[in-house]
């Protein structure tokens, strides 16, 4: 972009792909005080000043280090100098497990954004984080879909706190060292969290593997780009199928047909729907999901099953997914619409899909 530095131009290009619906309300910026999030804050501030947008900086303090309070307050002073509203979200007493800390952090951020009538949270994930995620997932045996890494735009990973909140990662195309060089040029320092160098954490071990020599010989980010292209194609196919065959009604999520899906795609789509119907944060995975999808697609005598907290029943013209106990969770239709929007590759589908709760009367029979 004319007149902008490379980091600012990359940041603004990433946000330019988002719909106004997400940007017209206060935009949350997650800022820990580390280099990545601090660069994110500066870039977002300059973008917002030019575009007339409103930012809300959010710092989560888990209270696990003596320095954390001072670091959060330092972010607050910087925000005050820039005229940005800043909230410190204190989560003292949280369980020290990484998974629990992550969930608590995302829940607090999502609640605060929703309280400010916002829909979008910006995070400082970089190209380095993407490469580390690739190695972590490869080590865990993830398939190609998972190896595509983090999405530029996704739904909040927590539920129900994250209902209506999206996460954008506008720095995924920028290396960490480039952001640190940007901060040095601005005369800004940053806080270093010792846990980022603790080999007890898997991400730190993967980071150490990504030495310059490996990056030259194993183009991890090039592999991620290729898998992302494949994922876009796969997501588009699932989105088109969902648009034609899936509706949320009062009795459950209704699916007209899985016909024509390759087995792997059918399992992936079914997992997404089971996650939504059960109101869970993760979909079921593995052999049980694959077998269930195969049974639904290939067997004309399918009568029902349970998986992932859901009961799957066969009706005359469709199958129905609903929680094993009780009604569908509140917000199910909106969550289904938002999931479809992410899959479409066009976030404007969020507005077009919102509120679709009716059940198609002309669903095509599956059996």
Curated annotation (Swiss-Prot):
Keyword Ligase included in the entry's annotation: yes
Binding site for ATP: 32-37
Location in the cell: Cytoplasm
BP terms from Gene Ontology: tRNA modification
Keywords: ATP-binding, Cytoplasm, Ligase, Nucleotide-binding, tRNA processing
Highest taxon above the source species: Bacteria
EC number, UniProt record: 6.3.4.19
Reactions mediated catalytically: cytidine(34) in tRNA(Ile2) + L-lysine + ATP = lysidine(34) in tRNA(Ile2) + AMP + diphosphate + H(+)
UniProt-recorded Gene Ontology molecular function terms: ATP binding; tRNA(Ile)-lysidine synthase activity
GO-annotated cellular components: cytoplasm
InterPro entries tied to this protein: Rossmann-like_a/b/a_fold (IPR014729), TilS/TtcA_N (IPR011063), tRNA_Ile_lys_synt (IPR012094), tRNA_Ile_lys_synt_N (IPR012795)
Chloroplast in keyword set: no
Entry comment, domain topic: The N-terminal region contains the highly conserved SGGXDS motif, predicted to be a P-loop motif involved in ATP binding.
HAMAP family, per database record: tRNA_Ile_lys_synt
Function summary: Ligates lysine onto the cytidine present at position 34 of the AUA codon-specific tRNA(Ile) that contains the anticodon CAU, in an ATP-dependent manner. Cytidine is converted to lysidine, thus changing the amino acid specificity of the tRNA from methionine to isoleucine.
Family: Belongs to the tRNA(Ile)-lysidine synthase family.
Protein name: tRNA(Ile)-lysidine synthase
Organism: Hyphomonas neptunium (strain ATCC 15444)
